[in-house]
Structures are given as C-alpha cells and as structure tokens.
Amino acid sequence: MSEQSKCPVTGRTAGHPVAGGGMSNRDWWPNQLPLDMLHQHSSLVNPMGEAFRYKEEFKKLDLGAVKKDLYALMTDSQEWWPADYGHYGGLFIRMAWHSAGTYRTSDGRGGGGTGNQRFAPLNSWPDNANLDKARRLLWPIKQKYGKMLSWADLMILAGNCALESMGFRTFGFGGGRVDIWEPEEDIYWGKEVEWLGSNRYSGERDLENPLAAVQMGLIYVNPEGPDGNPDPVAAGRDIRETFARMAMNDEETVALVAGGHTFGKCHGVGDPNLIGPEPEAAPIEEQGLGWKSGYGSGKGDETMTSGLEGAWTPDPIHWDMGYLGMLFKYEWELTKSPAGAWQWKPKDVAEEDLAPAAHDPSKRVPTMMTTADLAMRMDPIYGPISRRYYEHPDQFADAFARAWFKLTHRDMGPKSRYLGAEVPAEDLIWQDPVPAVDHELITEGEIAELKMRILASGLPIPELVSTAWASASTFRGSDKRGGANGARIRLAPQKEWEVNQPEQLQRVLHELEKIRDTFNGEQSGGKRVSLADLIVLGGCAAVEEAARRAGHDVTVPFAPGRTDASQAETDVESFAALEPLADGFRNYAKRKYSVTPEEMLIDRSQLLTLTAPEMTVLVGGLRVLGINFRQSPHGVFTRHPETLTNDFFVNLLDMGTEWKPVSHEHDTFEGRDRKTGEPSWSATRVDLIFGSNARLRAIAEVYGSDDAQEKFVHDFVAAWDKVMNLDRFDLS
C-alpha cells in the first residue's frame, strides 16, 4: 500500500467495500467546513412525515392517564432490571436530569428538548451508564401512546412522576418537545479522544467555551472531585463554574444537588473492568443495550454503573430532609467504594441512619456522600445556603421544585411553547417573557402607510436593514431564545453590544420611536403598533426599496403582533450569552478566535436554522445592502450599493480578479485586476469562502448566473422573512 493512498491524518486505508464505506472526505480533509450541520433533521430522516404536527397530537393526549401509567411503572419491578428498593424513582430522576442537564447557556445547545439521549454520543456517555435500561422500561408506555407523546416529553415527564410518586410536589410540566431522528452533529462536546478525558482546561482551570461539563462523557462534574482528586472545596469551584454555564445560580445548584440526591443510590459494588461496552459499541444481539456487567448477575445488588456505591439517605424512595440531615449530622471520612472510587462515609453512624440494602430490606448498610456532595457543606458559598435549606424545609422544597422545573424546561424557549394542563401560571424571568398583545393590530393599509413614513424619515437603507437584522438574528434555534419579539435591542445588554453599533442604533430607534408615537397618537381606538413590529417593518421596507432600485417590485411579507418587553422582564446576565462573538452576515468578529470566521458563520447559521442556500443568499444580499460592521468595505462587491442585486456573486466569481492575503493571519484579502494590477475589492474569509468551498461555490454560481437576478431577490426575501419571524411561535 503506497503512502499516497493512506489518510494523511489517521493513516487509515479504505475499509469495507460497501456503499458508505471506505475513507470519507472528512478523513482525507479533516478541516472541511461542516456544512452538513445546516441540513440535519430533514424530512428524509423523519418517519413521521412532513404533515405531522406534534403539537396537535399532544393536545389529544390524556396527560392524567399517562401519569397514572407512569406511577404504576415506578413500583412494577422487572426481573430483567429490578428496581432498587422496589421503586424506579431514582433511576427515572437520573434519566430526566441527564436528558436536560446537557444544556449550556453559551450557545443554547444540549438539553432535553429533542430526545437526543436516544442517540450517540449521549446514549453511550459513561455518565449515562444504564440509562438505556430506564428508556427500555418506558417503552411500553411510549408504545401505548405512540405519536401523541414524544420520547423527549416522556423522559422529562417520567422524572416528574418519579418525584411525585415519592412524595414531592413538583412545580409543573410543559409538553411540546419534538423528537429528532438522528444524532445532533452541531454540538461541540469537546476535543478529547477518550472517555473522561479532560483536555478542556487552560491556565489555572479555565474551562473551554462553550463547554460546561468538566470531562468528556460527564453531564456535570466528576463526583470524585476535580480529575478524581477528592477535594470538596476544589469540587465546589468546578460545580459553580459548570452549573453557572448551565444557567443555574448558587441557590438553584444547592437545591438541585440536595433535592436530586435525596433519592436513589449509586452502583459500584464490583470490578469495573467487568463492565461491557456501551450501547454504540455493544454487539448486535444486545439490541441497543450496553454496559453488560460480568460481575455476578450484573443487576440488582450486583449492578455496576458509576463505581460509587451506596445511597445518600436512610430512606431513598421518599422525599424528606434526609440528604441535608446526613450532610450536617455527621463528620465524613474518605474511603473507597468496592469498585475503587473515592467517596465518603459517615463516622460513628447511628443505626437509624443506615439505609436498607437496595434488594434485601432485611439488611442495613451505610450511606455515603461523594466529594461533590461534601462541597455543599464545605464550600464557603454553598455551605450557608445548604444550612438555610436544612433549617427551612419549606424554602428547600420550593427552591428544588423551581430549580427542577427550570432544569427540565430551560431549553424550550418562551412559555407560549409549553403544552398541557400542568403549565404553571407564573411567568419566570428565565423564560424571557414578553407581554401579550392587548391591542388591535395594524391593517395592510396601515402597514403600507408606515413603510412610507419610515422611508421618508431619512433613515438610510443600511441602517434600517442592520437594525432589523440585529434585532431578529439574536434568535437561537437551539433553546428558542432571542429574536425580534420584545424589542429587547433597545434594552440592556443588547443596546450596548459592540456589534450593534450603539450610536447608530440609538439614532435609528429614536426615529422609529417618533414614528410609533405619532402613529399611535393618531388612533382613536385601541389600535397600536409596537416598536418591535416597527423595527422589523423598517427592515422590510428598506429591502423592498433596495429591490425596487434593482428593478424588482416585491412585497416583503410582514406579520404584526410583536410586543415590547420591559427592562424588568429582561435578565441582563442571561441575555449576555446571546451577544454574537462573530456575525459573518455583518462581517463582524469581536476579536480573533481559535476557530476560523467561516466556521463561526456556519455555527451562527445553524443557530438561525438556515440552510446553506439560505445562508449564501443572505450574505450576498446583506453585503450589497451595506450593513457591514462600521461600514467596512469588505465583501461589498458592487458599484451600486443599497441596491438588491446579485453583484456579490457576479464579482466574486469573476476570474478577472486575483486575490491575495493582506494580513499575516490570512483573514483579510485584496482583489486586484489580473491584467492591470489595480485593486478592485477587499474581502474577509467569510466573503471568499463562497468562492473557495466547492459546495458553497456551487450555490454561488446559481445566484451569479445571468438569469439569476429575479431568483436571487425572491430567495433573499424568503430567507429574510424567515429570520424576521423565527421567534413568532404564534404564527407557526
């Protein structure tokens, strides 16, 4: 075999000679742009069909009947995987927690909103060991209710029912999570190449963004302590960083840990080397189950999971104050589990504080705490909070109920998306509430009149388009946050973001507010227009005018109905996570990053739920409309600015231009006429990628063709309309 026929990175040669086998393009060229993540979860992989609407099916569901079935399941112990203490509650709480607990605030990805625990890599993470059994236990219920109940909803609901069946009163439940049917390829879980690797820190323990978990394959932190070092104070620092990146403050963190660990037990009774492969690596006859243990029967009291062993409380299947009671009642001594994991045992434990053996109630065994648990007492911030909860059980119960609800619903977006009879009435700040529409909406005639007023105001096309884009493009399809509804672009922190060019933004908002106030003052009835609507309408009017200048009479769709949120309804710290580090659509980067600008464009496009053609046509259109950050000339490949032409593509593809880098980092470029040597254009990597990448060039060639101008305008308007309405869940 010649060296040329081997992969230059892995050294591998072609594998099985079947369709889809052999070396992939990414094996040969590992730095390929990940465009495939823009085309995930299409109708081609979804067996439900394009007409399926889960929201309508869920409305048919008898939620009470489902919960009754789940309550019955909790104590219906199965021989193939018997329930600890005769109750599956602890297992289902862990399943729901680990489904929701992958969420991180930085990019909104992860979480329990898609049922992704069914697929790799999550279904095979070490921290999810034996949760495959929990999902198999749920299958008869999923089978019974079919398309009316998604796996994503069922897993979270099972966690709620587990808590309720053990005496805890939950805060509520909102359905509406839609299942995916293939693994998510857009989520960066880390660069480690082995399970439990921790090559994600720099400096004195600076965790890489956007990650939240401390090691590959863990949901949160290492329960034995940082990198297995049993130091509770150091563990507290890891816990604080990780939970903060998952949207939890200190009080919520303590409530979740103490509340969740009131139930169930850990499993580490034998040799961890006897545990078989995870589901994705297990043999076909295991039928998707993994971690088959060769220690004894491999189940019941001989179960192996985390390597830790024991319950936290003397009564692991009832809600009580046992966790905090044990935490403060005893001093704790470092020991090792039978599997060799670091854990802590209570000194001189009283008989009444022993727990029953999980599968033999006649036996009593000691409880345990992990290093992470002891951080709830020994950390200087967590300790006083834990003590207060211990002394005030009602506060603790309320805090846990609210934190659990937040954990399991944080990635669902606004409350308007929640379904079912158990949705709490209370609005919560982390839900990014916007006021309900309490006025008559503007008519088509009034929309046309307002467009004329906006264009007559003297506000230039680039500023109107830029403001509308800045408002709407904060949306993240990952956790359904952001968007134009609420007009939060006028509030902190968005009004101060560099990318939004605050001085220009305030000038535009001031003019739009005057138009709004004048219009609303002219109305004799209850009709009004919100600033949120007017911001989007201004962008639409500007796009129409730019198209008219190019010779195209188009109407950009507009649907009124947005309202204006207040600063009190806006969590400044939470919204800070939505600030763009880079926005290739505006040719903006806050600073230089370890990833390329074109990769960040793909990332942002994926969050905006854009396809590669939509991304391409938007970049080309926005360049000629002139919305670049600080009016940069990069990528403005036109002699007719503020006119909606396909000039970006025509000039990018012109072989009469030769491009050369003008920066050492190869991030800015100059295009010169091949014959005269005269400079023609300047560009960034985000601009040139549409001529460099073969797949993007193929799309660019469509829009750069002589007959493409009308198609370009049509497609740009459609993609623009999509972005403007991404958060209009009332329209979908």
From Swiss-Prot:
Keyword flag Oxidoreductase: yes
- Example of a GO biological process term: cellular response to hydrogen peroxide
Where exactly is the Tryptophyl-tyrosyl-methioninium (Trp-Tyr) (with M-246) cross-link placed along the chain? 97-220
In chain numbering, the residues marked as site (Transition state stabilizer) are 94
Catalytic activity line of the entry: H2O2 + AH2 = A + 2 H2O; 2 H2O2 = O2 + 2 H2O
Q: One Pfam family name from the record?
A: peroxidase
A molecular function GO annotation: metal ion binding
The entry marks the following residues as binding heme b, namely 261
Gene3D superfamilies from the entry?
1.10.520.10, Peroxidase, domain 2
GO cellular component terms attached to this protein's record:
cytosol
Per UniProt, the keywords (alphabetical) are:
Heme, Hydrogen peroxide, Iron, Metal-binding, Oxidoreductase, Peroxidase
The ranges of region (Disordered) come to: 1-23
How is the cofactor bound here? Answer: Binds 1 heme b (iron(II)-protoporphyrin IX) group per dimer.
Q: Which cofactor does it need?
A: heme b
Q: How is it modified after translation?
A: Formation of the three residue Trp-Tyr-Met cross-link is important for the catalase, but not the peroxidase activity of the enzyme.
Please give the family membership noted in the entry.
Belongs to the peroxidase family. Peroxidase/catalase subfamily.
Subunit details:
Homodimer or homotetramer.
Described by its record, this protein's role is as follows: Bifunctional enzyme with both catalase and broad-spectrum peroxidase activity.
Recorded protein name is Catalase-peroxidase
